[in-house]
Regions:
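Non-catalytic accessory regions of SAM-dependent methyltransferases
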Residues: 1-122
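Non-catalytic substrate-recognition/targeting regions of SAM-dependent transferases
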Residues: 106-119, 135-208, 216
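Mobile active-site "lid"/loop adjacent to the S-adenosyl-L-methionine
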Residues: 294-324
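C-terminal catalytic and target-recognition region of SAM-dependent MTase-like enzymes
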Residues: 334-396
Length: 396
C-alpha cells in the first residue's frame, strides 16, 4: 500500500535510528501529499532512506512511529501487535489469574502501539486513544482484539473523551465497540479484593491499575497502624490497608463522588467494618487541621504538571504537600509518596521530597523506590514511558 510521505531535515533521523518512536514537527522538511490528521504515513531521511511508518498528527509530535521498516498497517499488523502484548501479560501471570482479572493489556509505546491504552476488567476491555491515528483505527483494533481473545471478551468500551487533542476536528463519542452496557455495577478483582469500576464516568479507564504492586506493598506495612489515604479516588490503598490489619483508615478526596466510590469499595470487601472513615475535603485543608495521629500516610495526587511550562509550580506543589505530611506523621511512621507526572523526572521528584524533609527537620530514610508495574512496560528506547515514581519513607 502507498502512503503519503514525510521527509526529515538533514541529520534529524538520529533519534529514529536509535528507535525512538516520536518525530517532532521541527524535524520535518516537507510532506508529499496532503495527509489527513491521523493518517498512516511513511517517513524518510533527507537522503531518501525509509525510516518507518506511523500516524501523522498536527502538533509538536508530528509522527508516532508504529514500525521502523516498510509494513502495511492492516488487520494482520494489529493482530500481531496485540498478540505480542497479550503474550507478555500471560508470561507475567496476569491473564486469568485466580484472584486477579484487572490489568493493562496495552501500554502505548511500551507495546509498540504509541497512542493506545487498553485496560482489562474481567471480560471487558476499556480502550483509550491518545492520538488521532489510534482514534481512526479503533474499530480495526477492536476487531483484532476480539479475534485474539475470542469469547473471553464480552465487551469493548471506547473511552477517549479528554485524551484526544482538543484542537482535532473529530466526530467523537465514547461508545461500546463490542457488547453494550448491561446495567448494574461493574466489578473487577485485584489480588482477591473486589472493586467497583465505572469506566463510563470515572477517571482514566475507571481504575488506577498502575498502583497494583504498590498497593500490595502498602498492605505489608499497614498492620496496627492508623492510616491516612490522601487523594483516595476509588480507595484502592484504603482497602489494601484494611486487609493488612490497619487499626484505622481515613480516606480523603476533594471529590464527593470519589469519597462515595471509596466507601462503596470498602463496603464491598469489609461490610460493617467501623475502622474506615472518609472525608470530602481539600488535601491541604485536611492536613492543616489534622492531628499527629497517623503513622502511615499515602500521598498519591493527580498529575501536578502535564507540560514542562508548569514544572516549577508542580515541584513546589510536591514540596508543600510532602512537607505537610512530614509535619503530621508520627515518629516511626511510614510515608508512601508518589508523582504520576511524566514531565517530572525521578530526580526532580526526589529533590522536592528531600527539600520538604529538610524544611521540617525530620530524619527520613528511603525504604523503597517505586515505579509502575510490569504490565506498563517501558521501551528502553522511549524513557518518557516511565511516568510513575514513588518513595516509601521511614520518618523518625
Amino acid at each position: 500500500m502507498t502512503y503519503p510521505k514525510i521527509y526529515l531535515k538533514p541529520k534529524k533521523e538520529e533519534s529514529v535510528l536509535r528507535l525512538h518512536p516520536w518525530i517532532f514537527s521541527g524535524a520535518v522538511a516537507r510532506i508529499d501529499g496532503q495527509p489527513e490528521e491521523g493518517a498512516v504515513v511513511e517517513v524518510f531521511a533527507a537522503d531518501g532512506r525509509l525510516l518507518g511508518v506511523g500516524h501523522y498528527q498536527i502538533g509538536s509530535i508530528a509522527v508516532r512511529l508504529l514500525a521502523f521498516d516498510e509494513v502495511t498497517i492492516d488487520h494482520a499488523f494489529w493482530l500481531d501487535r496485540l498478540r505480542s502484548a497479550y503474550n507478555l501479560r500471560q508470561m507475567l501471570g496476569l491473564d486469568h489469574a485466580p484472584e486477579n482479572d484487572t490489568y493493562r493489556l496495552v501500554y502505548g509505546e511500551g507495546d509498540r502501539l504509541p497512542g493506545l491504552v487498553i485496560d482489562m476488567y474481567a471480560d471487558t476491555a476499556v480502550m483509550q486513544a491518545h492520538s488521532v491515528g489510534m482514534h481512526h483505527a479503533r474499530r480495526d483494533i477492536a476487531t483484532a482484539l476480539r479475534e485474539l481473545l475470542g469469547d473471553r471478551l464480552q465487551a469493548i468500551y471506547y473511552k477517549s473523551d479528554g485524551t484526544l487533542p482538543f484542537k482535532a476536528a473529530l466526530d467523537h463519542t465514547d461508545e461500546y465497540l463490542l457488547g453494550r452496557y448491561s446495567g448494574g455495577e461493574h466489578l473487577a478483582t485485584e489480588r482477591g479484593l473486589r472493586f467497583g469500576i465505572d469506566w463510563l464516568k470515572g477517571q482514566k479507564t475507571g481504575f488506577f491499575v498502575d498502583q497494583r504492586e504498590n498497593r500490595r506493598l502498602l498492605e505489608q506495612y499497614a498492620s496496627d497502624r492508623t492510616v491516612l489515604n490522601m487523594f483516595c479516588y476509588t480507595g484502592g490503598f484504603s482497602v489494601y490497608a484494611m486487609r493488612g490489619g490497619a487499626r484505622a483508615v481515613h480516606s480523603v478526596d476533594s471529590s464527593s463522588k470519589a469519597v462515595s466510590l471509596t466507601e462503596r469499595n470498602v463496603a464491598l470487601n469489609f461490610p460493617d467494618d467501623d475502622r474506615h472513615r472518609a472525608f470530602a475535603e481539600d488535601a491541604f485543608d485536611y492536613l492543616r487541621r489534622a492531628g499527629n495521629d497517623y503513622d502511615l500516610i499515602i500521598l498519591d495526587p493527580p498529575a501536578f504538571a502535564k507540560h514542562r511550562d508548569v514544572l516549577r509550580n508542580a515541584l513546589q506543589g510536591y514540596r508543600k504537600l510532602n512537607a505537610a505530611a512530614f509535619e503530621k506523621i508520627r515518629p516511626g511512621g511510614i510515608l508512601f509518596t508518589f508523582s504520576c507526572s511524566q514531565v517530572v523526572s525521578r530526580n526532580d521528584f526526589r529533590l522536592a521530597v528531600f527539600t520538604a524533609a529538610a524544611q521540617t527537620r525530620r530524619h527520613v530514610r528511603i525504604l523503597h523506590q517505586l515505579t509502575q508495574p510490569a504490565d506498563h512496560p517501558v521501551s528502553i528506547y522511549h524513557p518518557e514511558g516511565e511516568y510513575l515514581k514513588g518513595l516509601v519513607l521511614e520518618v523518625e
